[in-house]
Amino acid sequence: RRQRQMCIRDRGKTLAYLLPLLLTLKTDDGSVQVLILVPSRELALQIDSVFKAMGTSWKTCCCYGGHPIAEEKKSILGNHPAIIIGTPGRITDHLSKGNFNPETIHTLIIDEFDKSLEFGFHDEMAEIITQLPGLKKRMLLSATDAEEIPQFTGLNRTVKLNFLPDASEEQES
């Protein structure tokens, strides 16, 4: 089975990365296996909602500013989520406090990468990546073709997937 690095663009992407993600989760692990970074609380909650609507038994934890970090820590330590969804600033806080083991994370997804850069999360995302020694797969999702994608991640043969044709392509048809 050949693994590829990819960059997904445009809309309709949440299920496109959540469904295959289920195949990578180890059932008897009990540790955080996947980290999904997002630029906003709203997107974190939306992704969590989509994941819960899928009806899996996997647990998630949303971590974002404006929410009590003590409650998030309690959820992480008590519920043993396989997936943590959060903003870069809050994830950095949890890592600095040792609230979860970053060594068990094998997949990193950065959703709305372009927005995360726009909101100034470059340094936090770069720092988080350095703390994930077991990382095997990275996925960046972006509505725009940000120049920083290959340079930021070290991805060298990205696969770009467009879920909807550009307006110019529609007019040509």
Where are these regions (language model features)?
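Walker A/P-loop NTP-binding motif
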Residues: 14-29, 50-53
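Post-DEXD/H (motif II) to motif III coupling segment of the RecA-like Helicase ATP-binding lobe
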Residues: 101-167
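Alpha-helical scaffold elements adjacent to nucleotide-binding pockets in ATP/GTP-utilizing enzyme cores
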Residues: 20, 46-50, 90, 124, ...
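Conserved nucleic-acid-binding Ia/Ib motif block in the N-terminal RecA-like helicase ATPase lobe
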Residues: 30-96, 104-107
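Conserved phosphate-coupling serine/threonine residues in phosphotransfer and NTP-handling enzymes
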Residues: 9-11, 40, 87, 142
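Conserved interdomain hinge at the start of the Helicase C-terminal
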Residues: 171-173
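Short, small-residue-biased leader/transition segments that mark boundaries at the very start
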Residues: 3-8
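Catalytic P-loop NTPase motifs of RecA-like helicase/translocase cores
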Residues: 12, 70, 91-92, 116-117, ...
